[in-house]
């Protein structure tokens, strides 16, 4: 990895809401971190909350999963404590997969509550939220403003070109996103 110029790896960690999936991810990450040269390269976690099954009618508060969301970040602490965990300006980097689907009554308040709990434990976070690849940049902005530190799009290579709106407006979306 160093020879190829890779700065760090991102490892997926699914929510402990599905303990089997969570255990699979933790076993995989821990296995990688036991290799003889694991400390030579940085890593970060990509948090995936999809198994919470959130949607506009089943928000995180209504499903009573706010504490699970916060607990999932606390479960990352053993990794944050590693010297080779990726940081940005001293803050621990966490990438949130499909952050645009974190259905909450108040996303900013949810993130602030989680950040406050981690701060009380001595950890500041730099959170990168993931936005759907074909959406204009200001779509779902209420999920990101005052919540995450940065936003990134999924790769445009994943776009299903058979979708009518994507087929007809792809270039407009691409122009807006860049």
Where are these regions (language model features)?
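Glycan-processing catalytic domains of CAZymes
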Residues: 2-178
């Amino acid at each position: 990895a160093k020879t190829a110029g890779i700065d760090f790896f991102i490892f997926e960690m699914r929510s402990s809401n599905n303990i089997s999936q969570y255990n699979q991810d933790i076993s995989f990450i821990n296995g990688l971190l036991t290799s003889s040269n694991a400390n030579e390269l940085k890593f970060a976690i990509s948090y995936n909350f999809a198994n919470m099954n959130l949607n506009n009618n089943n928000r995180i508060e209504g499903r009573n999963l706010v504490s699970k969301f916060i607990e999932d970040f606390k479960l990352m602490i053993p990794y944050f404590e590693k010297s080779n965990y990726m940081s940005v300006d001293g803050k621990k980097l966490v990438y949130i997969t499909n952050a645009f689907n974190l259905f909450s009554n108040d996303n900013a308040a949810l993130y602030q509550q989680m950040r406050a709990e981690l701060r009380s434990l001595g950890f500041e976070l730099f959170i990168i939220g993931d936005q759907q690849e074909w959406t204009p940049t200001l779509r779902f902005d209420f999920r990101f403003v005052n919540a995450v530190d940065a936003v990134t799009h999924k790769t445009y290579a994943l776009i299903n070109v058979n979708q009518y709106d994507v087929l007809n407006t792809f270039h407009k979306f691409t122009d807006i996103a860049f």
